[in-house]
Amino acid sequence: MQTVRVFDTWVKASGRTLHFDVITSNEATALRLANEYVASQGHAAVSVTAQECRYCHAEPLVMFSEHQQRQFHESGGFIVPLTA
């Protein structure tokens, strides 16, 4: 069974807090995906670091949807938006 790593991410941007999980296999990919996600939310000037994007725990990949599993295999991971 394939296991993925969950990176809990909190980012302050333009007076609001973005909270999301990055599901991937390593920290470098987590930071890349986190920065891409933050930029897609209109905050390209914000840089996500390992201080905001921290490894939290591991989960089996099969617990996520087929779409998310496909994203993991095609892009190296995916984002799960959460409420702040």
Predicted segments, located by residue:
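Alpha-helical structural elements
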Residues: 2-5, 32, 67
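Short, charged/polar N-terminal "headpieces" of proteins
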Residues: 1-17
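Generic structural motif
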Residues: 12-14, 25-27, 84
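Short, flexible N-terminal segments of the mature chain
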Residues: 17-43
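Acidic, low-complexity intrinsically disordered segments
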Residues: 37-84
